[in-house]
Structures are given as C-alpha cells and as structure tokens.
C-alpha cells in the first residue's frame, strides 16, 4: 500500500520535471516535437485568458492535445513492466496521468473552475512568470523546489491562491 503515496509523489515530481525541462526546455525550439506546448498551448491560454479551445475538440488529428495524450499513453506504457512488482505504485501513477489530463483539460475549458481549483496553474499561464508553477494537479513539487510563485490572475485581485492545496476539492 505504500506504493500509492509513493506513486502520487512520483507522478507530481514527474509533472514538474517534464513540464520544466521537456515542455518548456525543449519545447521553446520551434523544430522540437514538444514545441506544441509553448507555441500553441501557451499562446492560446495567454490570448484567451486561460481558455484553450483545442480541448473542446475530440482527440483526432495531429495537434497539441493528441500529442499530449500520446505522451501520457507512452508514459503509462513505460510503467507497465513494474505492474507485477509494484501494482499500487503503478496504479497511482496511471491514476495521476489520467487525472492530469482531466484537470488540465477542464482548467483550459473552464477558467473559473481553474481559478478555484488550480490557481497555481492559472498563475503559470497568466502570471508574470511562465517559468514557475510547473505542477498542474497539485503544487507539491513546486512548493518543495520553491518554484511556486503566487501572482495575481485575471480572476482574483488578491490573496494567497494555492498555499493549501489539500483544502481544495478537485470535483
């Protein structure tokens, strides 16, 4: 059963590392496979106050959302060999991957929901520093690495928005 909290922490660390070093690191180069994140997704979210209409379309064609879903699927498959020896860990990682896509999609279709439930992600897209707030589902690893930067967003004029993530329900 220790695999569940370890899997959740590992997945949150993975969000941080992948977002910071792959999506923003490699993704800033237009020639990179990962450029969709910076050049499509971030542009849309900034221009439309967090909304990325591409999430309203079905997962078809070759676009930012299908690339994101494919990367999550490949990541899930990479953990498959661990299933016989660490089923709770793998289950928690797979849950985290599915939850990541669910909340990330919802955040970019419903900005008011994002402000209430993922203020750190709103800060990532609409705040002054897009090179902070790397976590999407929970700000745990951002807090550990001191990359959680609270800023004003278009939805809330002041206050601490995200220092107590456990107090915010996801549903």
What is the role of each PLM region?
Residues 1-5, 89-90:
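Hydrophobic alpha-helical transmembrane segments
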Residues 4-12:
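N-terminal amphipathic/basic helix or basic patch
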Residues 11-164, 171:
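Membrane-embedded catalytic scaffold of the fatty acid hydroxylase/desaturase
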